[in-house]
Amino acid sequence: ILSALLGLLKSL
């Protein structure tokens, strides 16, 4: 879950 959030931030 946390890794998914980090991935989303990197996509920004």
Curated annotation (Swiss-Prot):
* Tissue specificity field: Expressed by the venom gland.
Instruction: Tell me its family.
Output: Belongs to the MCD family. Mastoparan subfamily.
* Protein's name according to its UniProt entry: Polistes-protonectin
Is Glycosyltransferase given among the entry's keywords?
no
Which GO BP annotation is one of this protein's? Answer: killing of cells of another organism
Function recorded in the entry: Shows high hemolytic activity (97% sheep erythrocytes lysis at 50 mM).
Keywords annotated in UniProt: Amidation, Cytolysis
* Residues modified to Leucine amide: L12
Q: Which organism is it from?
A: Polistes rothneyi (Rothney's paper wasp)
**Does the record carry rRNA-binding as a key word?**
no
